Structures are given as C-alpha cells and as structure tokens.
C-alpha cells in the first residue's frame, strides 16, 4: 500500500483504493480526515493553527478556517457529495506544560469542530487532547482510520 505523508499545513485527497494517507507527529496539530461513507474517497489535512485571520496562505491545510472548506472542495472535485462525508479528528494535545495559557491544541480542535458544524459534516470519532503525540492513518477504499499514541498500540477509530 503506497503511503502518502501529509506534512504540516498540507492536505491530500485520494480515490485510489490501497492508498494510505498518513499524518505523523500530531501534537497540538489536528489531523482531520474526511471520509466518504462508502470509503472510496478520503481526504486528510494536517492543521497547525485555528485561524488565518484573513491571511492568504499557500498551504491551505495550515489553518482550520481554510482547511475544512478546502478539503471538502477537493473531495467534491473527485465526485464525493458533501452530504456523504464524515470526519475523524486526531491530535490537539497540550504538548508543553509551560504553554498552558496558549492551549493551541484545544483551540485547533474547537476551530476544526466549528468548521465541520458550519459545513454540516458529522464527526464519527475523535482521539484528541492529552499530552502525547499521535500518528494517524486513513486507508482509501475501506475508509478505515487509525490513531497511535507514542509508545502505544494502534487504535481503530473508523
């Protein structure tokens, strides 16, 4: 199975069965998977920050307010109806105790959830918060989504 690594600020969409979309090192970032209910097309964004504040950004996956609609648009381009999408969220951890006032992970999660609510996309599952990094995998064709915390076993989310 070919792995397509989605780096910070990026997003990717595939409708090729057997592809695996992967986000590695999700700390305060949110891995946002949008999966067509039949699983034949999937998208993944590696969201770094909650808001673009009107800034134009080359990497549309960087900000939650840009990433959610961009990922939906990309899936529509490959023939997925937006009403058939469901979301899985991974990440949003509080990685550094000294940064508790910033709470970037929680703000990222809240912004992604708000974007999904505005788009009418239900959240199927989430593995968020805590204080450890995670890896997220999305299997195109089956729509299976897994998450693995550092030092732990992989867990099926969808």
Please place each PLM-identified region on the residue numbering:
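Active-site microenvironment for binding and transforming phosphate-containing groups
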Residues: 1-158
């Amino acid at each position: 199975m070919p792995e397509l690594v989605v780096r910070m600020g990026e997003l990717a969409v595939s409708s090729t069965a057997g592809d695996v979309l992967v986000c590695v090192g999700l700390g305060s970032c949110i891995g946002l998977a949008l999966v067509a209910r039949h699983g034949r097309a999937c998208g993944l964004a590696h969201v770094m920050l909650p808001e673009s504040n009107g800034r134009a950004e080359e990497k549309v996956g960087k900000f939650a307010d840009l990433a959610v609609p961009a990922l939906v648009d990309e899936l529509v381009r490959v023939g997925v109806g937006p009403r058939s999408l469901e979301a899985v969220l991974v990440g949003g951890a509080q990685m550094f105790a000294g940064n508790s006032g910033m709470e970037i992970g929680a703000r990222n999660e809240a912004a992604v959830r708000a974007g999904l609510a505005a788009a009418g996309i239900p959240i199927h599952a989430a593995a968020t918060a805590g204080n450890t990094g995670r890896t997220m995998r999305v299997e195109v064709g089956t729509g299976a989504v897994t998450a693995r915390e550092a030092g732990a076993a992989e867990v099926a989310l969808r």
